[in-house]
Each structure stands twice: as C-alpha cells, then as structure tokens.
Amino acid sequence: MAAVYGIQLVNKLNTATVRRTYLPNRYDILIDRLTNHTQHNVLHRALDFNATTREATVVQLYPPLNAWTPSSATNVTDYTYLEWVDFIQERSTTFSEVLRQRYPITTYANRFVNPLVVGAAFSDFLNADDISVYLEHLFYDPRVESPVQAILSFPYQWTPRFHVFQEFIRTGAGCKYARSSRDMTPPTPARLPRYGKHRPAYATVFYYNTLAARSTILAGISAGPTALEHFDSPTYGPHIILPQAGDVLGYHSRPVSQADLLMTESVMDCLRENSQASASTAVARLDQTYHPVANFDPTNEDSMMSRLTNLALLVVQGAQAELAIPTVPTNDDVRGFVARLMSEGQRQRWFPYRTDRVLIHPDSPFVLPPGDFYAAYRVANFPFTSGTYTSVPNATKPLRVLPQYRAATILPAQATQAYEDHVIAPININHGYCISGGVYFTADDISIDPTPFPARDLAQLPQNYFDPNRMARRELLRRLRVPSDRSYLKDNAVFTFLASLVNPATALPALQPGFSLAYLGASAAHAKSDEPTILADLRNGSIPGLPIPSRIAQFGYDVVHGSLLDLTRAVPTGTFGLVYADLDQVEDAGTDLPAANRAALAMLGTTLQMCTAGGVAVLKVNFPTVEFWTQLFNQYATFATTLHVVKPIVVNSSEVFVVMSGRQSAGNLTCTTSLQRALLAMYARNAAIDQTMTHVPMLGQADDGTSALGMEAIRLFDPLFVEGNPNAATSALATLMANVVPSSIHMSRLPVNGPVSTTIFGKRTFLSTRRRDRLLEYPLPMVTAINHQRRFTAPPSFSIYPTEPVNVTTLVAAGYNAYVHTVITSAQPAHLFDLGTGPECRILSLVPQNTRVTMVDSRPCAELMQAYDPNTTAYEQADYTLAAFWNGRQCDAVSAIFTLGAAAASNAVTIDALLANLLPSIANAGTTRLWLQVNAPLAGPTPIPGLIDIDTRAGTYTFNNGERTEPYIDPQVMQATVLAHFPNATLSWYTLPPTCEWLDYIIGAGSSLDLSTIPTALQYSQLTPILSIDTNVAPLRVNPIPTPLGQQCAIRIPTNDPAAVLDAKHRGVPVITGTPAALTSLMGNAALQYIQANNEFLLQLTPTLAGIFDVTLTSAGQPPIPRGSFTITAPPPTAAVTMPANIDYTDAGNDGPIACDPYYNLAVCIMRNGQYVRVNPEKARVETVAAGRALHFVLDLADNHVLMYLCDVTPAAIGAIIAHPLADIYQLVFPNNTPLRASLPYIGGGARVELNNQPYLSLTNPPPVLPAGTALAALATAASVGQPTYTLPAGAYRYVLE
C-alpha cells in the first residue's frame, strides 16, 4: 500500500464529482438566520454538547458569526456554554434590529447582501465598534460583480481591521471555533481540536480579483509564515491566507505552526470527504486541501508542511486513508494523525510540487475546475485505481508486557535519540483515583493526660496552609478521591467513636439508650437524600454499640427536615443528650482565620447551650488554631468532664471534631500534652501528604515528561523489533523500559489501514528514575513475545492510578522502601549488601545511584547486570545464610527486608538460630550498619485476621490465610541476639509512623490507597518491624529495665557535644525536644543534664506515655544521629473477674470484682460482625465502686449462647489489647427452682424456650397471649439494646437458637 510517511493510504481513489452552485444570500434570509433561535445549528453548533450538564467546550461557528474576531475588550471566555449562547442570541437579535432600522425588510427583503461586508459588520458589532461604514455597502448585485469586486470599488481603510486597497482586501480571519470557560486547560485526548482557529485573527486574509493582484499580494508577504490558498471554489472569492507566526501547543511533541494546523485540518477534511464521497451528492468543493503558495520549501522533507503538502497532492486525487477520519475528530485523532505523518517512513512523492498549480492524474475521479490552478499530469506505475474502502474496526484491550532482557546493551545517547523520534509527548493523562475506601481515623483523649501544657504554646496551623500551591494540592487530592459521600464517611467514623465513649466517673457509656440527638448543620445536599445520610443508620441502629436515638432534630442553613437557624447565635430550642455540629466555619468566614475562630467559638457555645446535663457535645472545627484552643479553655473549661479530639481523615484537611462529654457547669478541662501530640501528629501528616502530592501532576495538565509522576509512551508504525543489532524501534523500546516502572508496561496495537500502530507505554515515577540513573547502558529487551502479537487492542489508556488500591502487605512494603531510602541516603555506606533482594532488584530504585550495592538472592536476576557499572552494582545468586558465602566479603552496611523469616522457615530453624549463624559472618565482613526486618511482635502477639495468624505455642506467623508460615522472635530475644555479636551497637526499632511520611511511596509512586487500611498497616508493621543496628555510636542505657509507665527512669546517652539537641519521637511525633537549658516534654516530667565526667546526657523522666521511643542527637551543622530506642511498658494487659458466691437471677443483678490495672478503660462487649460491640448496659456494665471496679451483670438464659468479653476501650479501638472472655457466665448452669429471664441472643438472631423438652415460648415471634406466669419484663436486659426480655417461672428450661 502507498503511504506518506506514517499515513497509510489504500489503493482506491474516490472523490465527489459534482460541485454545488454558490447561491448568494438574500437580505430576508440573513435576518432569519440572525433571529431564528429555535432552530439549532444556524449560527453555531456545539460539537460536544452534554445533554445532562447542558455544557459544551467547543463550538463551531457559521456565517456570519464565523467572521467574528473578538477584541480584547470583549471577553466571553468566562461564560459557560449556555451563557455564551444567550450572549450571541441577544447580540444577533439586536444586530438584526439595527439592520432593519436602516434597511426595512419590507423594502429590501430580496436584495443580496455581501457576505464579506455582513461578516465584518457583525464582528465589529459584537465588539461594540462602529459599523456605519459597512452599512453603506451592505448590498451588491451578484449578477454584475462578485463580493470582492463590489468592495474593491471603495478603496480605503474602512476600519482598523478591514482595509480595502486598489487591488485587494486585507482583513483578519474570523474565529471558526469558540470555547467556553470549561475548556481553558491544555488539550487532552478526549477533547475536540480547534486547530488554533479559536484565536482572534489566527490568520490574515487577502481577497483579490485578478492574477496581477495575487502577484502583488505574494510579493508583499514573501517572508514569514507559509501562505495558503484554496484553489478549488474558494469561499466568496479568491483569497490567500497568511497564518499567524508562532506555534500552537498540544498537537505534537515538536512545535506545530498555525499554518501546519490549517493544512492538517484541510487534509483530514479531504480524506474524510473522499471516504464518504458519492457521485449523487454535490459538494462545495472537490479539493478541500490548501496549497502553500509562499514561504514554503518543498525540499525540506522533515518539515510538517512539506509532508502535508506531499500528502495533499495525493489526497486531491481521491486518495483515502486506511484509518477512518471521524466526522468530529478529537485531539487524540489529530495528534495521532500528526504523529503518524511525522513518524519514520517513506515520502512516496508521486506528484511534484508546483507553486501555482496542482497536478492531477488522468485516472483520478477528480473533476478539474476551470482556470489554470489545476493541470493533468500522468505518473508512471501509479498504484491507485478508483473505488471506495471500508476501514477495519478496533479490538479490545492493551496487553501487559513484563520486560525481559538479552545479553546486549545500547548507549543511552543512541537509544534516547531513537526514543525521541517515537515518543508521544505531551501525553494527555488520565489520573484515575488515588484515594478510595473509608477513613483513616485517629482519636485522642485530652483530659486523661495528667500533664498540663500551655495553650499558647500549642502547635499552630502552618503559616503556609493557605499558600495557593498548597491549597491547589489539597484540592487535587480531594478530586483524586473516588466519588463518595465524604460527609457520611466522617459522620460514620465519629458516631462509631461516640459508641465507645465512656463516662469516666461511672464507667458507663456516655450515650445511654433513649438519648436525643440534635444534628446541627444538617444539609440537603446529598446525592441520594435530602438530609445527612448518617441519620438513616442512626434510626435503624446500624452503628455498632450506639443506641437508637429516641428523637432526632435537624438545624442549619440548608436543612429540609428541620429548622433554619444561624448557629453562631443563641437558639430557641430545648436540650439534647447529643448535640452533633457538622458546621463549617468557612461557610461564614472563608479563610479569614480570626473570623473562623470567632465562628467556631460561637458555634461551640451554641452546641453546649443545646446539650443537656451529662450529655455530649461535638463540634467540627475547620481550623484548630492556637487562638481557638486558648479561648476554648478560657471560656468553656467548666462545661464538660472530658475532652477528646478526633480526626476522620478523608482528604488532607486540618479539620478536627471536638468532643466534650459529660456536660456540666463545674468541669475542669485543661490543655494537656496529649493535645499537643495530637496537633503535631496531624500537622506532620498534613505536611507529609502535601509533600506526596508534589509528585502528582495537576488535572488537565498534559504530561510533557517533566513531572516526577506520569506516563511515557512510544508509538511506532509497523515496527520491526529485532534481536540483532538494534534498530530504531528496539532502541526506542529500550529507552522506554529504562524510564518506566517495569511492572507498568503495556502495549496497544491498533490497525492503521493495513499497517499497525503499536503504542508501548508505562508509568514514570521517582523510583523508576532512580533505577534509570544508575544504568550505565540501557539493556536491550527480548522482543520475541512482542513480535509474536498479531492481536489488535483498544487504544492505550494513560491512567496514572489503578482502580484497585494496594493491599496491606504492599502498603507496609512501600513504607519500608521509604525508610530504606532515607537511612541509606543518610548513612552513605561505602558498600551495601542487600540480602534477599528478589529477582526484580527493588533496592536499585531505593538507594542513591552512587551507592555501591551488592544484591544477594538465591533466585536468578531479572535485571541485566552488564548494563550497570560493575564497580557500583552487582548481583550474587547465592544463599546468604551459608558461612561460605561470606568468605572474603567486605561491606560496611547490610539490609535484609522481608527475607529473614523466609530464610529461617526454609532452613527449618528459629530466627535467633539463623541470626546466631549469620551475624558473625556479617560482623567479620566489617559491617557497621544493619537494617534487619524481622517477625517480632513489638506490642505483643496480637493477630491480624486474614493477614497474620499467630501460633504462640509454635512461635510462628501464618501469612495471608495460609500462604506461608514463618517463625517469629521475641523483641527482647532479638536485641540480645544482636548484642551478643555487636555488643556496643545502638539499636532502634522502626515501624510505620501514623504521620504517614511514607505515603510518598504509595501515592507519589502512582499506586492507589484505601485510607481505611492504614491502621491495619500500622498494626502489621508492629508485628514485622525493622531493627536498625549502628556500631558507630555508643548505645543509650536505660534504668530500670523494663521501664514501667509512671515510674521515674534514667536514660544515659553518650555524646561529646554538650550543646547537642536531644529528640525523642513516639510514632513519628517529637515528644521530648531540647537541650539541658531548654527542654520540652510531652510525655511527663523530664529533666536533662550533661555529665561532663562521663561525656553523656542524663535524661530523667517520669513517663506518662507508653510505647517505643526513638532518640536522636543533633549537633550544629550535622544531620541527626540515631542513638537508639527505649521502651516504656504499659501495665500488664490482664483482666479477671471474681464471680459472686451467691448468684442472683433477678433484675437486681450481680457484682463481680474486676482485677485490672486502672490504666485500662474497660467495657463489656460481644462480638458482632468481626468487631467488639458494647452490650446493653442494663445487661452488663463496668461500674466504679469504692474498692475499684466491678462487673455488674443480669443473667439471662441467652448467656449460654452469647459469649461476652471484658474489653479495653481506647479512643481508637475496642478490645485491641484486652479481650477477656467472661467464660464463667457463658458456662453457667441455670437452676430449675427459681424464676429466670430470657431474651433474644443478638440483633437478627432467633430463639425459643422449651420446658420439659416441650415448646414453651417463641422469643422470635412471641404469641399475643403469654404462658401462665410469664411476663414481659419492665427492664429489658437483652445483650442488644431494644430487644425485650421475658420473666419465666421456675422450671427446667432449654434455650434453643433458631
């Protein structure tokens, strides 16, 4: 088949053969066009009108509107489509009125209007300019003269934009397209092209009437852009078009001039019309293409204009493209056309270029018009015949390509040159969604912390919070979250927290059955409801452990089922047990922080005013500034018993929910270090997520390859990928595979009228860039699998984020990747050994390119090592657990991530036994820094169902429901094992911090995230931590060990710098910071002094916070140096209940003393849908008594079928540490000589009671008349609130589940 470079042509010629006769425009017809607003597509047509949104972005203009050249004073780009239509209709109607005032239609209806004059007049009228000169020459007689001749009779400058000379007319080309405010971003593949013809005066037009005048025009434009001309039936008369100088972006990786675009549009139009042409249909012109007539070099075959002209000379013959040209092409279609035209290929120039003439083959169906611009020209061996052609349809989906390499490389410069010839740039990317799922929820109890903290010193809202770039990144993240009811997600998280809220004085739930609810800020703006979506869950009891409210009242600005109120003012309402204020201060204050503070405090006052004594008040605060907290504690410290700050993280905002429980007038709330820790954590997390979003390109921004995160693609036509000496296709592919993440590579194959367009694309991230920068040469890929493909696919989908979020294991691995990069970059080891690397050589994308690294794994390497510098990069296929491997090895750093557990399992040894054999070899190699990930339960062996099951007897973890089993090691044993071989080492434990700095390696690396999986990932990390070992610095020493909570301890940190700054972090948040002269502690009383005699710091601390704390020292001008970790142990997480000697089976209940450290808040729960849910407090509850705490419970026959637990309750979870089964109650044998009670076991469960093995009472469907002696109990003591209880006379009952 013939081709002009990448434009494949079929061997059939087809054109229309009948030209439509031009009919002059009558005056009455013009008036109809201007005033007929009911008929569509008269003056304009929306090419992409959306019937749902009533919007359009690209509008094609028709005469006389297409003569409009908008002036700078006429700015309509801010209009929506409908606003633009209104504007045009109003102005066109007014224009017609102006015309009719001058020329009444009854008199002038059958006169012919000059289309050039009408267009110019309408343009100036829309620009609010004077049009009187045009009205003088509105009419002409087409029987006597042409529109151009009529105007040339009056040679002078009519207006600044319309100049009539003796021989020709000069005017600006009117816009042929308009765009709305919805299309202000750079072009994207799905958008429609405008070919630059939306720009005012995109070209200058010279109308002439004689060849002499044409020569004069050409002489005057002999320098500048390429001039173009329609030879066949030019509109209104012969004219030459001189496009604007400069380039139009968005159509090709290289600059495209305005002339190129006009020529491109004309060629595409002609190709489309050729494919649709029929002898039965007359057309305005047979040859739609332009012809360059000045400032054009046909010999420059690399220029776009030269190639377009070459193609146009074939298209005018009737040539058809194998790939169909859509009726309304998209940017993607135009870019693809241009890319194919500018790709490698043969020019196949069948017809020579003539400046003033187009040569036509005698066998072409094209009918030559009169005149000298077309001439016959016979070509030898012309491979075309007349006929039509039907294009081949596309197929299904792109194919994933996993790169494999052969033992050959290519120099980057050589490969990149080929890549640049085939790269698609810029790419109009589809972001997809990076955030999905529920919320990441945090909660902090402010009032439980005994250590006060000055409110004025609290962490302040970051000064750059309202920086435009930071606001843009927050908005970008919001838009990249899967569409959902964000208000519902937040409400659900907060109400779930409220279900676990406890009155500290009584140990009873803060919200008792029958509480009333006032929802402030209730909005009707929800997709499927005209009230807050959470209210449906509250009414049907769907929030686990939360009683159903007795009534719900709604208030706010946008309420439907309630009352309109300004909630910054006093309100005329009653009081409620729970006042929930989902109020936005930005509604009234915007980003004015002082105004927002005042609004928040006024709303808090209203919320508390509406709250009944003992109730709970909740307020959403958009900007929790120091000023807000200061006034909260100044004005409202006496209004509640407890204060919590909860944060449901849906997007990256600073808003928090303030929960004030136990409403009273004599409270004593104080600002504590707990609040400071919560704010520091939140702002650190905000900053981390903001940093992550710096990698992500803005929406609507075409990917030009400069952003850290994006897509790269090459497109080739009928590529021949070779295994021998690399050709251009193979070289370009090698560059692409070097640039992108290997696992992200896909290929798309599309038929292009015989030849195939092959697009290979992948995701570019900062990780792939690190790997590429380490390459000395680019490895050449094996192309067997690619060459084997004969399937066609769907077009490529340049989507950054996949639809499925990463799983928890991948989330943890990504977090550890971030840690490895940080510590290796900081430590700058001379030679790193990475153990258990894996065939994909992940470490190469984590460490700096100049770090010497040796990777060790028993599996063969999937990378081509000869492409790397052997002095910095090596791969050893070996078993690193063997002592023989280490003979003669030298390294100063070792990393082993997610490998030691598997190695121990494969060798059938424990981890400590494995390390006992491995660590001596590592020490002998000269290693001073180690980072060892191990299976070690730092917070105790608490399993994660479905992810990590723990067998404490066998000492093993089972991952992913049996996928693999590995041993685990006690953290203390791990430390002792390490210190046995590195006795002076500093040891630090690393787990994922909730401040989320590691999200860079998820969102910033192009992976999707389910926010609700973050807590699980943090828990997973607690079971699989990394131990950092540093023999270069002396370790800290702690006394006593273990170090219990609340007991003073001494921590000694060796250092020669008495001016060093000490930092101790807990879960990523600094809790101790400073020097001996100025020390701040957020974890209890602390004092720091420098002991000169011992060259050490002495930190004396009475801790109020349990956990693992990482200590660093920072000397002036130096990076922080880790000095180890110390652990503050919480009281033993044990609980026991002593059953009373005499059991009471009435509703008076029983009390059993509880033995459990008061550090733990307790509640009685049952398991429901995999989580612990509080039971009905009338059934069982924890009460505070003089001797401590007691379990109060009322017995029920259902107790033998529903196991209750005594669980710890924290703001974040229930039963995470203590879940003590109340087996004595579950196993109780009920007597037959005393009245008993019976209830349903749980919501949704059915049961019946049998007496003497005979049916007695159905609890599922109780009869209208109860058996004798049986009654509905006044006090319902079922495990679930709202279910009835029945009293039964003495008897031998059997309780049966249904």
Curated annotation (Swiss-Prot):
GO cellular component, one term: viral outer capsid
Catalysed conversion reaction: a 5'-end diphospho-ribonucleoside in mRNA + GTP + H(+) = a 5'-end (5'-triphosphoguanosine)-ribonucleoside in mRNA + diphosphate; a 5'-end (5'-triphosphoguanosine)-ribonucleoside in mRNA + S-adenosyl-L-methionine = a 5'-end (N(7)-methyl 5'-triphosphoguanosine)-ribonucleoside in mRNA + S-adenosyl-L-homocysteine
Subcellular location: Virion
Keyword Methyltransferase: yes
E.C. no: 2.7.7.50, 2.1.1.56
One example GO MF annotation: mRNA guanylyltransferase activity
Keywords of this entry: ATP-binding, Capsid protein, GTP-binding, Methyltransferase, mRNA capping, mRNA processing, Multifunctional enzyme, Nucleotide-binding, Outer capsid protein, S-adenosyl-L-methionine, Transferase, Virion
Catalytic class of the enzyme: transferase
Family note: Belongs to the aquareoviridae outer capsid VP1 protein family.
Job of this protein: Outer capsid protein involved in mRNA capping. Catalyzes the last 3 enzymatic activities for formation of the 5' cap structure on the viral plus-strand transcripts, namely the RNA guanylyltransferase, RNA-7N- and RNA-2'O-methyltransferase activities.
Name assigned to this protein: Outer capsid protein VP1
Native organism: Aquareovirus G (isolate American grass carp/USA/PB01-155/-)
